[in-house]
């Protein structure tokens, strides 16, 4: 179970300032045939793991499968990740740190759809094959953040847009690739999988879950996590 980051980065060809809305931001997508081109130590380590798994099949005949998925969202995600981080910060009135201009584009998939894809691939996938898992649901970070702000404010009973003042642009992080976008048509055509949840419904479910499980979030974000957060953003 790997990541789309192993493929490197794609060009962003839609005009600057164009809103996301879940549509594609370019004509190119990562396919199972895309050559690996990791740009960070993290993605290089994931690429190495993928090759290690394939080598075990080639050398020892071990039955293997590799999946590469786009960004996940949903319940129980560790709060350092963008969506739970911003939900929690809005709830607590803390700044919403946006790397650079927020123009980086990611494809988002609800976690239960990812789990369902893994189940289908595990039981019906071709041994030693690779399958990409994605939502065809691209969002610029800044546009996604505005959706989160609007949803959280509405569910908390805040005036519309009240928390937008918390958006704070910070220095971009090293090795921050501009665009990832998965082509998962192979998985759809061969095994019949496709996302079942529309993004708007998934975000609503996700925000509601974190707001209804504040103790879970507070327990995790206390202690050492708070030290990590301060080292990253304060």
Task: Tell where the protein language model's regions lie, with residue ranges.
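Catalytic helix-loop patch of NAD(P)-dependent Rossmann-fold dehydrogenases
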Residues: 5-66, 73, 77-79
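C-terminal substrate-binding subdomain of Rossmann-fold SDR/epimerase-dehydratase oxidoreductases
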Residues: 18, 84, 90-234
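Hydrophobic alpha-helix immediately C-terminal to the catalytic Tyr-X-X-X-Lys motif of short-chain
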Residues: 48, 52, 56, 86, ...
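Short beta-strands and strand-loop turn motifs
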Residues: 66-69, 99-100
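Active-site proximal helix/loop that lines the substrate pocket
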Residues: 3-8, 71-77, 103, 123, ...
């Amino acid at each position: 179970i790997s990541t789309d980051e192993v493929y490197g980065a794609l060009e962003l060809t839609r005009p600057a300032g164009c809103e996301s809305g879940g549509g594609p931001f370019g004509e190119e997508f990562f396919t199972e045939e895309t050559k690996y081109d990791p740009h960070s130590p993290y993605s290089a380590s994931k690429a190495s793991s993928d090759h290690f798994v394939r080598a075990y099949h080639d050398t020892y005949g071990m039955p293997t499968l590799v999946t590469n998925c786009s960004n996940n969202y949903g319940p129980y995600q560790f709060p350092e990740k963008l969506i739970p981080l911003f939900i929690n910060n809005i709830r607590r009135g803390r700044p919403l740190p946006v790397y650079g201009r927020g123009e980086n584009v990611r494809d988002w998939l609800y976690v239960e759809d990812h789990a369902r894809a893994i189940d289908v691939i595990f039981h019906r996938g071709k041994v030693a094959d690779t399958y990409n898992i994605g939502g065809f649901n691209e969002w610029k970070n800044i546009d996604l953040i505005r959706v989160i702000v609007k949803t959280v404010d509405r569910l908390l009973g805040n005036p519309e847009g009240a928390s937008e003042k918390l958006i704070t642009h910070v220095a971009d992080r090293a090795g921050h690739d501009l665009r990832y976008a998965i082509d998962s048509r192979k998985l759809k055509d061969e095994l019949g999988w496709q996302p079942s949840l529309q993004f708007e419904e998934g975000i609503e479910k996700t925000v509601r879950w974190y707001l209804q499980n504040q103790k879970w979030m507070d327990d995790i974000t206390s202690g050492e996590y708070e030290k990590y957060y301060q080292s990253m953003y304060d």
